[in-house]
Amino acid sequence: MTDNNQNNENHENSSENSKDHHEARAGAFERFTNRKKRFRENAQKNAESSNHETLSHHKKEHRPNKKPNNHHKPKHASQKTRNYAKEELDNNKVEGVTEILHVNERGTLGFHKELKKGVEANNKIQVEHLNPHYKMNLNSKASVKITPLGGLGEIGGNMMVIETPKSAIVIDAGMSFPKEGLFGVDILIPDFSYLHQIKDKIAGIIITHAHEDHIGATPYLFKELQFPLYGTPLSLGLIGSKFDEHGLKKYRSYFKIVEKRCPISVGEFIIEWIHITHSIIDSSALAIQTKAGTIIHTGDFKIDHTPVDNLPTDLYRLAHYGEKGVMLLLSDSTNSHKSGTTPSESTIAPAFDTLFKEAQGRVIMSTFSSNIHRVHQAIQYGIKYNRKIAVIGRSMEKNLDIARELGYIHLPYQSFIEANEVAKYPDNEVLIVTTGSQGETMSALYRMATDEHRHISIKPNDLVIISAKAIPGNEASVSAVLNFLIKKEAKVAYQEFDNIHVSGHAAQEEQKLMLRLIKPKFFLPVHGEYNHVARHKQTAIACGVPEKNIYLMEDGDQVEVGPAFIKKVGTIKSGKSYVDNQSNLSIDTSIVQQREEVASAGVFAATIFVNKNKQALLESSQFSSLGLVGFKDEKHLIKEIQGGLEVLLKSSNAEILNNPKKLEDHTRNFIRKALFKKFRKYPAIICHAHSF
């Protein structure tokens, strides 16, 4: 073949290749156009089908507020939706999917430009997802006022008022323990003065769960004021038992049993109880809808994914409200200093199994009487290792009976024995479940340890499991019980066994999850001392809540919240009332002050008889002291006081001597000054004066 022929053939082949190439490109473009057309048509059909199904579904559900999804074909700019950051339909975009147009460009400029639009769209989606507050009506003048009466600046005693100008609800009514030195005071309850002021607009008391620090004050409140009381069955069951003890059975007529996931109207509020995990059965968070916006109150909580009853926190409902837009979150701060997550209640089981398996004698397990899951687990392992179960302690027996009767737990009755039957069984066949984990002097465990219990004393071979942590303020009491148990040579499993107790409160990672689910505009950390709520504030800031949208409250503070603002508007009288738990009676503040005075400075008592004419003490006058000096020195002290009074009477005028009240005050003032000069303290003075 010649060179010319070769060139001609190459030219012909090149022309044919070029023609084939152009035909291939035309075919590819046609196929691309047809594919895009089919894509749009299918997407439109799917959207129409989805609209039809959605509309039919909403008709069945009777939810008129839900509008059919017609976003694929907006008729007017006002109909554009923010759903999935979709502002408009481009030629190459169908329902959140964009096709690439710059397929054959030489570089990547157009391709990257299209990708960048996708990045911007997804960023917009994320921003709106994290901040759904645009759904709130910022022009609304409605607001709510939050007033904590207990539970802030302290551990326990939780009580809070949420109110509008015309309506109010009270969330929880709990008790707390007194500090050392409040002699004869067993529990503290919130001051109800503010409730008396607003009683005409209180629509109800809302209970989150049945722990004592949330329900312990209810009988004392109902002795003064009565309102509808809303709660889940266990909460109302335990409150009802308290009412029986206080002679308030008739007030059960105020009880309202609620169902979770079912919003109800209470005054001007719409409230939904949302299942939450905690260290007691049937705990709830609250979704409170108001004209100003939605409020979420977590109650006490942790996020337990493997709870004993297999009923985890209802994260869906929390997220549901978060997507709708939440104005205010009030969240549990108790464990705000604890990093990570709180272990599941179910992690206790292996430790119990090991301890019960290895125990040679009796097993005595003490925990909070309200921690029914903990008690239930202990009893199950007692049964597993063929032990008879003795439940000892009034509150423990009561709570367990109520939980069984209501169907929360199921246990064979034949496994249980009474306290007076324990001695009939070998030690390795007995489990005693009892109260006293906080070292209470009247508890069953304390009385066993001090040989004061009628039927049971601690033996050297006993294994005592204290499955609880000391509440702040109770450390000394718990230590005292531990000392008694160890002196009895019992084996004690307490804090060195980290896996026999877990907290019921959320640690930092769970608090973060709650904040991310709810995405509140404003945040009020609750439940804890000031250092706890301050640490919770830092966690909230890390989760995107602006610092200016967070306020740290104390008991008595009044904070007003609206869609566009949060501010402190005042302070009301708050404080504590004292209760003698043995008599179930309140103790006047003045009595507590007198007891403190006597404890710190002692008492001096004087009953004097005066001869007015001689201006002298009669021999029948009597003096005594307590807590000032020892018995040996008391006579010398009394002689000093008598001598001083003789001098005082000689210089007293007739007006004082003839008026018993003035004579008594005159004598008291002299004794008070004399004792202060001698001891540099003011003892309590008991003085009676008579003149003849």
Curated annotation (Swiss-Prot):
Gene3D superfamilies on file: 3.10.20.580, Metallo-hydrolase/oxidoreductase, Ribonuclease Z/Hydroxyacylglutathione hydrolase-like
N6-acetyllysine found at: 135, 141, 324, 338, 398, 512, 548, 635, 650
Co-factor: note: Binds up to 2 Zn(2+) ions per subunit. It is not clear if Zn(2+) or Mg(2+) is physiologically important.
Cofactor(s) the protein requires to work: Zn(2+)
Region (Disordered): 1-91
GO annotation, biological process: protein homotetramerization; rRNA processing
Protein name: Ribonuclease J
Organism listed in the record: Helicobacter pylori (strain J99 / ATCC 700824) (Campylobacter pylori J99)
